[in-house]
Curated annotation (Swiss-Prot):
This is Na(+)/H(+) antiporter NhaA. InterPro entries: Na/H_antiporter_dom_sf (IPR023171), NhaA (IPR004670). PANTHER family: NA(+)_H(+) ANTIPORTER NHAA (PTHR30341:SF0), SODIUM ION/PROTON ANTIPORTER NHAA-RELATED (PTHR30341). It comes from Sulfurimonas denitrificans (strain ATCC 33889 / DSM 1251) (Thiomicrospira denitrificans (strain ATCC 33889 / DSM 1251)). It is found in: Cell inner membrane. One of its GO terms (cellular component) is plasma membrane. It comes from the Bacteria. It is a multi-pass membrane protein. Na(+)/H(+) antiporter that extrudes sodium in exchange for external protons.
Length: 444
């Protein structure tokens, strides 16, 4: 094919949704790591006061007498993180419908492993903090940071099988679902029924849009935003609105594949009937045909697929890095760091994320495989599953998020939890990587 500009080359890669998902999570993991380092440096530098002051600065949004007055820190955690939870909701829905969780036989192992990896860490933390002020933080070590965990696994390249990566992704998705349920049920303030009722009505409107075949994204955005506002006033954490809204987004395309192929082929045949000009300029009618084909390409992709694809980049490059910058910065007094790590909250978090995750995930997996309930991921060994269980101990994003909810208003307890999260996540990530890189043997 002759190109108008021969020195310009276009390279196109058609990636599967799963490959796109892995790439997005790897990008998120790298950005998360970078901004965590920046936050820690700022919090332990002469600029620490300015750093803290920025995120505690209030931003007021009022329309008449109605509005909100929250700090930048709260706008990030309650507002921007709702977009992150919306992405989680879309990923959960896709995985249940057509992804790693759509086949119950394949999904059984990661589902059981995730349950073990949530229950045992919570029990270990609760046992250490039973009857103490930190008891409410039992949900902190339940979470796995999917971005960090997948980034570590992707760095191992061909040393791990694709099915092992799929196992970790499915496990983390179930883990995220569990974390959302825990946040909604157990980390909720006093519930205000009227705003909650309006939020429910907003959700019903979103469902009706889906049922009536509305595929335009704008109506879902407007009503979803209204639902988030009501959820913010209801007492249930506003980020839950993101997950609920995702469930109402249509997952079916406007056209069937057969109708799409027939329609596009007809339009392209019409396009070819026009003569090619010497200067390669298109006729106006050709431009209209191409626009029509573009519209049909958009229509063959479901709204949920389009949103997941378009939001991954801003979430990876803006939302998650801002969350890390606002929440990961803890001022560490190295002379008392050891004492902090020995506090029940820090100990509970570390024991939960390291020992709880490892024995919860690997232990349940081993039992399920031995009992014939589930099968080992193809091309993998139990030793590799043990390494993946260590990576499951990287709690970070969701763990910090739950810590902020569990100990809201008590900065000292939040600090202890964050120290435990940072220490456990660092240890779990490094040890899991070393185990999979140098110790675990692959099936091949």
């Amino acid at each position: 094919m002759k190109l108008y500009a021969p020195w310009q080359r276009a390279f196109e890669k058609i990636a599967t949704p799963f490959e796109q998902f892995l790439h997005a999570q790897t990008t998120t993991g790298l950005m998360l790591m970078l901004m965590t380092v920046v936050a820690l440096l700022l919090a332990n530098s002469p600029l620490s006061d300015e750093y803290l002051h920025i995120f505690h600065t209030n931003i007021d949004i009022f329309v008449g007498n109605y509005g909100f007055s929250k700090s930048i820190h709260h706008w990030i955690n309650d507002g921007l993180m709702a977009i992150f939870f919306f992405i989680i909701g879309l990923e959960i829905k896709r995985n249940i419908l057509v992804g790693e969780l759509s086949n119950i036989k394949v999904a059984m192992l990661p589902i059981l492993a995730a349950i073990g990896g949530m229950a045992l860490p919570a029990l270990i933390y609760y046992a250490i903090n039973y009857g103490d002020i930190g008891e409410a933080g039992w949900g902190i070590p339940m979470a796995t940071d999917i971005a960090f965990a997948i980034s570590a696994l992707v760095l191992l390249g061909r040393r791990v099988s694709a099915s092992l990566v799929t196992f970790l992704v499915a496990l983390a998705i179930v883990d995220d679902l569990g974390a959302v349920v825990v946040i909604a049920l157990f980390y909720t303030q006093e519930i205000n029924m009227l705003p909650l009722l309006f939020a429910f009505i907003s959700f019903l409107v979103l469902v009706s849009f889906n049922r009536f075949g509305i595929h335009a994204i704008l109506p879902y955005f407007v009503v979803g935003f209204i639902m988030w506002l009501f959820m913010l006033e209801s007492g249930i954490h506003a980020t839950v609105a993101g997950v609920i809204a995702a469930m109402a987004i249509p997952s079916r395309p406007k056209y069937t594949p057969m109708d799409f192929t027939k329609s596009v082929k007809s339009r392209l045949d019409e396009y070819d009937n026009y003569p090619i000009e010497d200067n390669y300029m298109l006729h106006e009618q050709q431009k209209a045909i191409l626009q029509n084909v573009k519209d049909k390409i958009d229509a063959i992709s479901s709204p949920s697929a389009r949103l997941e694809h378009s939001l991954h980049l801003p979430v990876s490059l803006v939302v998650i890095p801002l969350f890390a910058l606002a929440n990961a910065g803890v001022s560490i007094n190295f002379s008392s760091a050891y004492d902090t790590l020995l506090q029940p909250i820090s100990l509970g978090v570390m024991a939960g994320l390291v020992f709880g995750k490892v024995f919860g995930i690997a232990g349940i997996s081993y039992l399920a495989i031995k009992l014939g309930i589930a099968k080992l991921p193809e091309g993998s060994t139990m030793s590799q599953v043990f390494g993946v269980a260590f990576l499951g101990g990287i709690g970070f994003t969701m763990s910090i998020f739950i810590a902020e909810l569990a100990f809201a208003g008590n900065s000292e307890l939040v600090f202890q939890a964050k120290i435990g999260i940072l220490a456990a996540s660092l240890f779990a990530g490094i040890f899991g990587f070393i185990w999979l890189r140098f110790i675990a043997k692959s099936a091949n």
